[in-house]
C-alpha cells in the first residue's frame, strides 16, 4: 500500500484529497481512512463497501477505483482539528490490515480579495472591496 509523502499540507476551510494505491488481488477488499495516533487504535472515519464506487459520510468521501487499484479520500471544510496522523487502510483476511501512514498539517486560511461594482450612485463613486481573512469579511471604501 502506498500513498503521498508526508506531511500533506492543506489550508484551513479547503478540501484535501489523498490517493492511495494497493496491490493486485485486493480489489474487492474494503478500504478505509483512519484517524489518530497508532495504526492499531486509530478511529475509522470512512470505509468502502468492497465494491467500486463512492461512499460519503458528512465531510468525508471515499472512492475505490478497482480497475486502477487506487482509492481516494476527500475531506471537505478542513479545520485545525483535522490536523493529525491518518492511515489509508486495506482490510486483509487472516492477518493484519495493510496500512499507510499520512501526516496531515493544516495551514492558516488563504486571503481572498475581490471587488464588487454596483449601479448605485453611492457605490459607483466608492468601489466596495471585501477582504476575506480568516473567514470574516471586512468592508473597505476606496
Model regions: which residues?
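Short loop/beta submotifs within extracellular cysteine-rich repeat domains
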Residues: 1, 40-41, 68-70, 80-81, ...
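Solvent-exposed loop/turn motifs of extracellular immunoglobulin-like beta-sandwich domains
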Residues: 10-17, 26-28, 66-70, 77-88
Amino acid at each position: 500500500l502506498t500513498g503521498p509523502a508526508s506531511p500533506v499540507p492543506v489550508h484551513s476551510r479547503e478540501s484535501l484529497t489523498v490517493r492511495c494505491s494497493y496491490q493486485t488481488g485486493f480489489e474487492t477488499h474494503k478500504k478505509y481512512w483512519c484517524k489518530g495516533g497508532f495504526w492499531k487504535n486509530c478511529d475509522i472515519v470512512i470505509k468502502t463497501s468492497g465494491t467500486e464506487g463512492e461512499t460519503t459520510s458528512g465531510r468525508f468521501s471515499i472512492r475505490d477505483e478497482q480497475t486502477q487499484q487506487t482509492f481516494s479520500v476527500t475531506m471537505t471544510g478542513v479545520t485545525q482539528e483535522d490536523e493529525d496522523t491518518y492511515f489509508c487502510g486495506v482490510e486483509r483476511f487472516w492477518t493484519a490490515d495493510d496500512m499507510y501512514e499520512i501526516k496531515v498539517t493544516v495551514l492558516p486560511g488563504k486571503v481572498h480579495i475581490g471587488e464588487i461594482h454596483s449601479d448605485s450612485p453611492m457605490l459607483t463613486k466608492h468601489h466596495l472591496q471585501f477582504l476575506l481573512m480568516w473567514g470574516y469579511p471586512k468592508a473597505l471604501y476606496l
